[in-house]
């Protein structure tokens, strides 16, 4: 068998690319040319993106990469993992990633977001979600960092809420949006939205 041959497989709609020259494996949806990101639901008071192949971080410090992969997969119809993103960026799995790392990774996968050094306004949250663009959220707690993907919003009784995908728990939460600092609970700590990667305008 020629070990220098590039081998591709298509399994149940997933195109698994095994490049034996580099020893890397990547995955993408075979019919992504026809893929269009969709909303889970839309109404006058709620808009939620229907996430596609959302990713967890596993046992590693890959929340940043899993959040990037979740956004990229929804936008592009792919099936990248957190490890795929970290490998492409050349970052070790337990090193963690900065806002700049996440923004660059998104851009490399064709999701042209900017690094924004604060929590974005409610107007900008709505604008991004309305355009089917989940938001990369970097939060802090006692000097530590954690990343999630914001993929929806709603208004109920004049209160504003955001939907987030947490790669640490591989689950969705709905939390109150607060102009002074949106918070969420994870791993027995309270985390505050600190930085953002999104379309800025």
Residue ranges and their predicted role:
Residues 4, 8, 18, 84-201:
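Conserved active-site-adjacent core of cysteine acyl-enzyme catalytic domains
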């Amino acid at each position: 068998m020629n070990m220098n041959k590039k081998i591709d497989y298509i399994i149940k709609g997933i195109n698994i690319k095994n490049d034996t020259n580099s020893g890397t494996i990547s995955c993408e949806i075979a019919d992504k040319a026809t893929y269009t990101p969709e909303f889970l639901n839309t109404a006058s008071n709620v808009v939620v993106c229907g996430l596609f192949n959302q990713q967890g971080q596993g046992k590693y410090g890959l929340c940043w990469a899993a959040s990037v992969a979740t956004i990229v997969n929804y936008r592009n119809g792919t099936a990248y993992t957190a490890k795929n993103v970290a490998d492409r960026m050349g970052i070790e799995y337990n090193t963690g990633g900065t806002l700049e790392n996440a923004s660059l990774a998104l851009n490399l996968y064709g999701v042209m977001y900017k690094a924004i050094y604060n929590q974005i306004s409610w107007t900008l949250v709505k604008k991004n979600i309305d355009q089917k663009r989940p938001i990369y959220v970097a939060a802090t707690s006692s000097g530590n960092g954690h990343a999630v993907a914001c993929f929806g919003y709603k208004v109920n009784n004049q209160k504003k809420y955001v939907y987030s995908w947490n790669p640490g728990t591989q689950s969705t939460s709905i939390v109150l949006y607060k102009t002074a600092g949106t918070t969420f609970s994870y791993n027995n700590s309270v985390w505050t939205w600190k930085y953002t990667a999104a379309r800025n305008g």
